[in-house]
Amino acid sequence: METLFTEPATQAKGIERLAREADTLLEKQQAEYLSLEVRSVLNRCSSSRMPFTWTINPYRGCEFGCRYCYARYTHEFMGLNRWEEFEEKIYIKQDAARILARELTPERLNGQSIALGTATDPYQPAERRYEVTRSLLAVMAMARDLGLSITTKSDLVTRDIDLLRQIGDRSRVQVSITVTTLDRRLARILEFRAPTPELRLEALRTL
């Protein structure tokens, strides 16, 4: 899995420079996990058409490799232009919870809604190892009057039912699990490494 960087890291700026300087945490057969330094995890949504004001993405890239994914282009901001690199190079925002604790103030949010997982799946395989999403939920469980929505294709979300309940006691929380098709063969073609439709339906029953 070669990275197609064409310029030295010293000439890159912003997120591209951070991506080039990222340390490799783990190399798997089909993906590489890298640590990504970030200054902020709360991103304001500029579109009035969206039902949320803020977004949080615990990772950059997504190992599920959905063929129709609209977020693949975001890797281009880091100088990664090959289609497959979105699922091959997964950037881990390991310090995200500490940063969110600083950013998550009543004055800033004022009851506004947060969408978790708009450009990545917050429960992709990396989450089992690094638990960035769980650490973010732990921070949000301490807040009040949030509007949190989570979108995922993974049954791993059921692991965090304890934190989702805590958040629900103080705020509004909604979990959406995408089930594109019940045809397992077609799902494997469209959503290469995502959990099977049966596992997702079972997660919905559990929730």
Predicted features, each with a name:
Residues 1-26:
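Polybasic, low-complexity association/targeting segments
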Residues 24-59, 67-176, 180-188, 196-206:
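Conserved Radical SAM active-site core
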